[in-house]
A protein has these predicted regions:
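Alpha-helical, largely C-terminal catalytic domains
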Residues: 1-737
Length: 737
């Protein structure tokens, strides 16, 4: 039962806990130290937030002893102090700013806290004098920063500083939603919870506690990002399940995953809790998949030393310890709804060994794991197109007709009609010039041609990779092709490049030079990074296809933004405003929310239209409807309704950000009229982008059943088998040019 003794709003589900929790032997010392430290910082009697009894009942030392079982006594005390500070900050911000709805005061307080966290770039004095603390939160942060940061690399300090700032600043997002009674949509919630929930910050502390920094060379690579994000989501979802009664029932919080799913699906609290637990299990299993399937290739590609590999593995084990230990603490702390507070670890009596074995063997969630690998292609019939919520019209360029003809000739010149994958009638049917004409209706004819070429090239490659590399499980060939494509994107137009040997290479080499030649060096680097991200995502798709694996829902959606080419869209738009919009604005919650909502909306629309093409004709698994069917175990119509509801919620979030969050962002950053006008134009460009993509999907002859039958029949002709031999092969194989 909960600490109040009242009926629980739902029964806690059966959790997936594959690793046993361990307890640090220095617990008693950490408890005593935490009490003295909190009192010394002014967090107890007289603070108006906690009394000694509160701290003792919450027992953060027990949390840290479970989540950091191997560190020594002094390190455990330091880590415990950090968690005392974080939880005190959360309760302090609630009492002082959230309850009164004082956004201005909250923003001022958070700005001051940043002064106690020097970024620590190379050459910076991390012990630089900070202002005199005015309250327990500032005093605690000043003390902890000075005790933690010295001795760490600039990369770790920068990452830890960002995650700590996010933890603090995103409290304003929660405050804003409370003030207007708004419950976030599921995708928005996951993204914001990572920041305000603090688990990415906890991951940084794990590096500190285990004495194993993640090497800077790989700290931003996808496998490390996924490990961190899976860790964060799992920690947050678990906390949401245990804290629902207190946060939602007593404190009026709206930032809770159970409430988010309850609101989105219109289901009961119990049903929402069960679904959140399934998502928690899925994220933990994604962590395991990433550890075993993605880390080893990354080690080889990055050329890490044995010591660096050991550091990454030690860090990953630390995250694993945190998951199991955090679960054990939630079962005990009086802060949460639980049935076993204060009881010995694990069940006792007859059958207890079997219960523990079930958790260790991962039987909980086993059916979901199996279902992700056993999906088979099958006839599905024509894709059903629902009524989409899209409040923005499409305007078309007057250069459209000319661009259509020029694009077909460009396809021919690049050799896209010579490899058995595309032919002229097919390219005409696809009509990418129509999409470009709506994305930028004011573009010159030349710029429209470049835009259409990018869309055509990207789709050609998107058709090529699954057929040539995914279906054949030729991961080496995919990586070889990837390396050659990267070699064709010099930052200087005059730089020598290898001669292209196939259509996808010729297309990239041509459109790359036409795009970057007029750019400034900074713009070229930004755009190169965006295209690199898209290339990375294509390899991820091939790897999933080779493993015959339906992705985790969160991982899929986040990667879908990239596979859809969204980073290229964002980078080109940002270049137009680089001179008037400060770079840090693009990292703000409002800007990231706006972009992600737009990108998700259009990527999911593509999944709705392409369902029959990808599932029935191509046997692919990377489609949000397939992911939804697999995760929920539901039929196509139900999955379609869920995806369309998600699209609608993302579009409404886009509108909400523009109406509510952009004005606040303008004030928070003190932006002048020119910067505000530039960002308003960017928002209008995103509206045009979404509307153009919707118009193109409705009119293209790429997804209709009669066109699929015609296109598929011709692609299946013997010419395809002959042409496949001319497609890229791994460098060590005969025939590579």
């Amino acid at each position: 039962m909960s600490s109040t003794g009242s009926a629980q709003p739902f029964e806690l589900p059966e959790f997936y806990v594959p690793h046993p929790a361990r307890l640090n032997p220095h617990l008693a010392r950490a408890r005593a130290h935490a009490l003295d430290w909190a009192r010394g910082m002014g967090m107890l009697e007289g603070s108006g937030v906690w009394e000694q009894a509160d701290l003792e009942a919450h027992d953060y030392a027990l949390l840290c002893a479970y989540t950091h079982p191997e560190c020594d006594a002094s390190m455990l005390s330091l880590v415990t102090d950090w968690y005392v500070w974080v939880f005190f900050f959360d309760d302090w911000f609630l009492e002082v700013f959230k309850r009164p709805g004082d956004r201005t005061g909250g923003h001022t307080a958070l700005e001051r806290l940043a002064l106690f966290m020097p970024d620590g770039p190379p050459g910076h004095d991390v012990n630089a004098r900070a202002p005199e603390p005015r309250n327990p939160v500032e005093a605690g942060l000043a003390d902890l920063w000075a005790r933690t940061v010295p001795g760490h690399s600039p990369d770790w300090i920068a990452r830890f500083s960002v995650s700590t700032r996010n933890l603090l600043v995103e409290s304003l997002w929660e405050l804003d939603n409370i003030s207007i009674g708004r419950v976030a949509n599921p995708v928005e919630y996951v993204e914001q919870r990572r920041k305000v929930g603090g688990a990415p910050w906890s991951a940084g502390l794990v590096e500190h506690a285990v004495g194993a920094e993640v090497p800077a060379a790989v700290s931003a690579e996808r496998p490390l990002r996924v490990l961190r994000d899976c860790f964060a989501d799992s920690v947050h979802f678990r906390n949401d399940l245990f804290s629902y009664e207190r946060e939602v029932g007593k404190e009026g919080e709206l930032s809770n995953g159970v409430l988010v799913l309850e609101t989105f699906f219109g289901c009961t609290t119990q049903e929402a809790a069960d679904q959140l637990n399934r998502l928690l299990t899925s994220r933990l299993q994604q962590f395991e998949h990433t550890f075993f399937a993605e880390l080893p290739p990354m080690f080889v590609r990055a050329g890490l030393t044995p010591e660096q590999v050991a550091a990454v593995l030690t860090y990953a084990r630390g995250l694993q310890d945190w998951q199991s230990g955090g679960h054990e603490w939630h079962l005990r702390s009086s802060r949460y709804m639980n049935r076993r507070a204060g009881l010995p670890s694990g069940p006792s009596g007859l059958g207890s060994a079997t219960s523990g074995l079930k958790a260790l063997l991962g039987i909980t969630g086993g059916a979901d794991r199996l279902r992700r690998h056993t999906r088979t292609p099958h006839p599905v019939g024509p894709s059903v197109i629902p009524e989409f919520y899209l409040p923005y019209p499409t305007r078309l360029s007057p250069h459209l007709e000319g661009a259509r003809g020029r694009l077909v000739e460009w396809n021919r010149a690049m050799g896209m009609f010579d490899e058995g994958l595309w032919w002229e009638d097919k390219a005409v049917d696809y009509d990418f010039a129509l999409c470009s004409a709506g994305i930028d209706p004011k573009a010159s004819a030349a710029d429209l041609d470049v835009s259409a070429a990018w869309l055509s090239w990207g789709t050609y490659a998107d058709d090529l990779y699954p057929l040539r590399f995914g279906a054949t499980r030729d991961l080496a060939g995919a990586r070889a092709q990837d390396a050659r494509l990267r070699s064709l994107m010099p930052l200087e137009p005059e730089a020598p490049t290898p001669p292209p040997v196939n259509a996808v290479e010729r297309g990239l080499a041509d459109v790359w030079l036409r795009t970057i030649t007029p750019m400034a060096p900074a713009g070229r680097r930004m755009f190169r990074a965006a295209v690199d991200a898209v290339l990375d995502s294509w390899l991820w798709e091939v790897e999933n296809q080779a493993a015959h694996r339906v992705p985790d829902p969160v991982d899929y959606l986040e990667m879908r933004r990239v596979t859809f080419g969204s980073p290229m869209t964002a980078s080109l738009a940002r270049m137009a405003h680089m001179d008037v919009v400060p770079e840090e604005v693009y990292g703000s919650a409002a800007m990231q929310s706006l972009e992600a909502a737009a990108f998700d909306y259009s990527a999911l629309m593509n999944d709705v239209y392409s369902y029959q093409k990808e599932v029935e004709y191509e046997g692919e698994l990377l489609n949000m409807l397939v992911v939804t069917e697999t995760f929920f175990g539901c039929d196509y119509r139900t999955a379609l309704r869920v995806v369309n509801d998600l699209m609608t919620s993302r579009m409404k979030q886009f509108e909400h950000v523009l109406e509510k969050e952009f004005p606040a962002m303008y004030r928070d950053f003190g932006l002048d009229a020119a910067a505000r006008a530039a960002l308003d134009r960017y928002a209008d460009e995103l509206k045009q982008w979404m509307a153009a993509i919707a118009t193109w999907h409705a009119e293209t002859r790429r997804y209709r059943e009669e066109d699929l039958e015609r296109h598929h029949a011709r692609r299946s002709a013997p010419v395809v088998a002959a042409a496949a031999g001319a497609l890229p092969r791994a460098p060590h194989r005969a025939g590579w040019a």
